[in-house]
Amino acid sequence: MKTHNFVSVRLFGGLGNQIFQYMAGKSLAVDRECDLHVDSSWLQDGYTHEKSTISEFRFFQPDHKYERKHRNLLHLYFDRLATVASRNSAFLARLLGIHAPKSAGFEDLSELEIGTQLRGYYQSPRYFMKLADSGVISEASFELLEPSQEFDSLATQLRRSGYIAIHVRGGDYLHNKAGYIQMTTKYYLDALSLLGSKYSDLPKWVFTDDENHARNLLASIPNLNFIEVKIITAAETLILMSRADAIVCANSTFSYWAALISGKTSSIVAPRSWMEKTNRPEDFFPIGWQII
């Protein structure tokens, strides 16, 4: 007889992915009126980016956290095997108590049993919007718990004149076998053109994990400034980006969340295509964003 009174979610990947996963888990826990347990063992094992942790945000309030690393490679292997088995067999998914969807987007979680662990991407704004509509969470919930002095200094500097935030992903995006589409110089030129004269005189600040790549990609765009992201955390970088007057997103969940919590619409530009073989669902982009 099952006595669980919780659902759980496994976090992995960069900060944008972690936020999507947490929102899916929180939405399910609220629906079921049960506790939310968060499994960050994969983050402890290094399945994330440097300085990328969701726990810096005020909204991150799980009822229980499981933060231990896997005991050894064999333990990690069997854990991976359980995920794959659950993804391919509904029977094993119920037996193991794992929800491992084949798609990266929205999943109807209403039929899941209490005690199930979510192991997927859940890249849909629906979970966040549902929580926001019910008052459980809001854009203000993304307040940083302990902002650093470096963050405060940058925030003050940027606030003086206003700014456009331009996000460029490099690093793993240039070599990842998952098939990310590479953003082109034309995309960024078109995006800035779409924003129009209203923002043309604002300083342009580039947020990137690969400055050399970004400088080469944006060489034809004059008067760029580059945020020194190594001195602040991923959460702090996301908040700085969200406070911009206009945002040019990359095909990244990181700048997606910065734009989503900014409260802006027409001053957000994002690429329509993210992956080579899959498309974003129609409801992925909020109404009013400029999608090109």
PLM-predicted stretches and their roles:
Residues 5, 49-199:
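Secretory-pathway luminal glycosyltransferase catalytic domains
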Residues 2-8:
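Extreme N-terminal starter segment of soluble prokaryotic enzymes
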